[in-house]
Amino acid sequence: MKVQTKTWSLPVQDDWSTPFAEVLLGQLDLRPGLSILDIASGHGIPAFYLAEQVGPTGTVVGIDASRSQVASARAIQRGELPWLRFECQDMRAMPASLPAFQRLTGNLSVMFLRPNRFEAMRGLLDHLEPGGQLVLTFPSLGTFDSIWQRIDQEMGRYGLVIERERLAAHVAERPSAADVRGWLERLDMERIAVVEQPLEVVSGSGQRFLQHPLLRGGFLDDAYECFDDQRLAEEVMTQVSLDLKSMTPLIARRCVLAGWKRVSTIER
């Protein structure tokens, strides 16, 4: 067998995926020999770490709907950790042929279960063994509230009614800690834990704010989508970006949900 020389610790330079993975690992019962299904595996945080911990007697399968993310993860792997594999698969519609695992993890994953998150989570549990553990993380309701409030204020100054309604809908669509606890209870999970921890994101003002790699992709783009007129969107968002002081600190809520599948489940 090929001797493993590389270590697969969580990358310290990642200011988003790693902090969320840390709260996931804080709830995960992890030991050698486990089989793990890691959903929304992206480029491998924390799939590589999980594979290193379960060792060659275990199995880790990372799935992601993005072919480019799967290709990136495979390129990083480069033949290491042969008991780890990455596959392109929509976690909302997994084939019945996919087996059940002892652990089901997903870092920054809950948002990708939409539009019917509860039904999608119920489907995930078909691939968790009885007595197995589910641990998922996501940025919960309340994440970057100061940003949404400032954008709403600026929209109000411009007299924008439809755009404000769309923004409110975007914000309300994000699940809360109470929401996900309710899902786990309805799914008859046991030893449920739902924990939120703050994460401060640092940014400059102006274009540094508007193009911030953590803020733009999953958050500010939602605000831009509220506008039919993108020139107006740019004008409003530029005004917001120049008022960074009123929004700081920029706080995300790292939410981790965990629960154990009963050996004998009761459908509710």
Feature locations, PLM:
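A short glycine-rich, Lys/Arg-flanked "PGG" loop and its adjoining helix->strand segment in the class I
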Residues: 118-133
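Core SAM-dependent methyltransferase catalytic element
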Residues: 255-268
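A short acidic, Gly/Pro-enriched loop at the edge of an enzyme's catalytic core
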Residues: 95-104
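Helix-to-beta-strand junctions that scaffold the AdoMet/dcAdoMet cofactor pocket
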Residues: 55, 113-114, 128-129
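C-terminal helical/coil "lid" or tail adjacent to the Rossmann-like core of SAM-dependent
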Residues: 193-247
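Class I SAM-dependent methyltransferase SAM/SAH-binding core
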Residues: 37-39, 43-94
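Conserved alpha-helix/loop element of class I SAM-dependent methyltransferases that forms part
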Residues: 15-34, 49
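Conserved catalytic/acceptor-binding region of the Class I
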Residues: 133-204
